[in-house]
Amino acid sequence: MSKKLHIKTWGCQMNEYDSSKMADLLDEYQGYTLTDDATEADVLLLNTCSIREKAQEKVFHQLGRWKTLKDKKPGLIIGVGGCVASQEGKAIKDRAQCVDIIFGPQTLHRLPEMIDQVQRGEKVVIDVSFPEIEKFDRLPEPRADGPTAFVSIMEGCSKYCSFCVVPYTRGEEVSRPQDDIILEIAQLAEQGVREVNLLGQNVNAYRGATHDDQICTFAELLRLVASIDGIDRIRFTTSHPIEFTQDIIDVYEDTPELVSFLHLPVQSGSDRILTQMKRGHMAIEYKSIIRRLRKAREGIQISSDFIIGFPGESAEDFADTMKLIEDVAFDHSFSFIYSARPGTPAADLPDDVSDEEKKQRLAILQDRITQQAMRYSRQMLGTVQRILVEGPSVKNPMELRGRTENNRVVNFEAPHTHIGSFVDVEIVDVYTNSLRGIFIRGEAEMDLRRSLRPADILAKHKQDDVLGVTQFTP
């Protein structure tokens, strides 16, 4: 009888990526297969996020539900990972006696050893250390799951914004070597991946080592990824304005694989609040980046993060944020009411904006951005859009679902043989969260660059030096 693994994931795309790696790791090394049913699992893993309010209590509520499963099945192993585990490991150990393993984002690669330790009789195994980038060296080869894939290029953040826990839970910025990233993406492309999303807490701070002891910048990495045959779209998440340099903007001018959509968090439009947040830039500098981006790539659409009701935020500060939203014409946003994160400098500031005021401001902001997004969507009516077909439509499995470059979901009728490929569709209807399209043509009628398999590229560029050391240059 096969061993079963259940993973519950909260939070960002990095957590989603980490959870997929946990599943691959435990499948390859210990034979665990994933299940959606927690009641049939032999190992339960909770991958946590500490960004939202009351994150710790949310963890304990979930563990309480899992404790009832363990009471019925004493051999069940429960593990807690992610940012809450990194930040609150001792509290979890003290309060949740059902937990066997506590691990941080940088130690998930040690899960097989931790499970072995528990099975040998150790009571609670804890490892929330930051062992540089070691975890990537010990993860199995990537497995594609559809035509899109996340690829982590770096970990941590060194910006220390006053409201943010990431430097304390994931550590400071550490970049993966350039060759490791290129090889992983080439392997994914060979399995049918057409779009990659490069992940990091601050991807534009990427500075990865090369095989000849040089440093690869983020702009250089983007061009290298674009050169991998079969990869026709590149996205990345997320960025910080202070390191969105001109060389990155230049890539938008000459690299069509990089999509015309950018998520660039600003958090506030008030210079006073930006200073309090320790963001390191002013609103005018953010607008300068957007202006240069739109000069390099006409029609690029921008999304952002906003924190509403940061300590000391006045009506004037909020008005500055709304002015920035109007000036930039954001297409989408992730906007949140401020709540203090324990251990951050902002947690020591008086939380002096009332809950009612925060909610009102959030509603105003979200309504404005929804209006702007609908305006962009209506402009797409009658246009032909290139869609990467991701799978069947959620609401109607007989139809197909894909995404435009600007990250809009499109539903349309076409044969399921198009899943995993590009199609052109005409946009005929607009809804709040999706578009409706009519199939125009399939990939066979397009001039897409797929003359070589990634394996051929690797073989062509792989050379052994006189010491027998293999080097790969894309």
Swiss-Prot record:
Cofactor, how bound (note): Binds 2 [4Fe-4S] clusters. One cluster is coordinated with 3 cysteines and an exchangeable S-adenosyl-L-methionine.
Subcellular location(s) of the protein: Cytoplasm
Residues bound to [4Fe-4S] cluster 1: 12, 49, 83
MF terms in GO: 4 iron, 4 sulfur cluster binding; metal ion binding; N6-isopentenyladenosine methylthiotransferase activity
Gene3D superfamilies registered for this protein in UniProt: Methylthiotransferase, N-terminal domain, tm_1862 like domain
E.C. number: 2.8.4.3
Domain Radical SAM core: 143-375
GO CC, one annotated term: cytosol
Residues annotated as domain MTTase N-terminal: 3-120
Positions of [4Fe-4S] cluster 2 binding: 157, 161, 164
Keywords of the record: 4Fe-4S, Cytoplasm, Iron, Iron-sulfur, Metal-binding, S-adenosyl-L-methionine, Transferase, tRNA processing
Alphabetical list of PROSITE patterns matching this protein: MTTASE_N, MTTASE_RADICAL, RADICAL_SAM, TRAM
InterPro entries in the record: Elp3/MiaA/NifB-like_rSAM (IPR006638), Methylthiotransferase (IPR005839), Methylthiotransferase_CS (IPR020612), Methylthiotransferase_N (IPR013848), Methylthiotransferase_N_sf (IPR038135), MiaB_methiolase (IPR006463), rSAM (IPR007197), rSAM_horseshoe (IPR023404)
Cofactor(s) essential for the protein: [4Fe-4S] cluster
HAMAP family in the record: tRNA_metthiotr_MiaB
Subunit: Monomer.
Family to which this protein belongs: Belongs to the methylthiotransferase family. MiaB subfamily.
Function: Catalyzes the methylthiolation of N6-(dimethylallyl)adenosine (i(6)A), leading to the formation of 2-methylthio-N6-(dimethylallyl)adenosine (ms(2)i(6)A) at position 37 in tRNAs that read codons beginning with uridine.
Protein name: tRNA-2-methylthio-N(6)-dimethylallyladenosine synthase
